[in-house]
């Protein structure tokens, strides 16, 4: 019998290529030999797992992790983690990390001259609920130069990491903001050849989650696999 829920492989061009010459570091990182499929044993498929009790409500509000408020435009980023049939994926660990409002990461390898914000660490995490929903409160990140090519600037973006039943089932992607003029020039964003697929990386302004006098809302749904899969980093 035909099963309409069977896995539908993503179409060519809807995921980033391993090698995208305009993205300079991919030239050295891309595999030069055929990939080797490693069989999964029960050990890999059953664990290790992330302790849900380690995730607290404070982890999802990046504006309330220090004694003072961070600088910048406050935003609410929410959405659902979905499978290929549009069903919510419950109890998935979602992590984010990002630059501050000035375009600076709290990382020893970030040498951008923009200032750090003592009230903003730029990372958070949350577990999806029974319907696959998640929600973060944060600050809209700034653009920053990154040296890939002449006058190279990364668009405003937030990194997402998603874990499945175990820590070995991890997917990583980036969320961008609507109307950003830098998207046209960004080789990472454009490493996904299919334009409709690229647009799935751009969040939508969400009036329903926008809070009066507090924060603008953005919706970003993440599809884990199938024909409508969100482009994921290799």
Task: Enumerate the language-model features and the residues they cover.
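Beta-strand-dominated extracellular/periplasmic modules and repeats
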Residues: 1-234
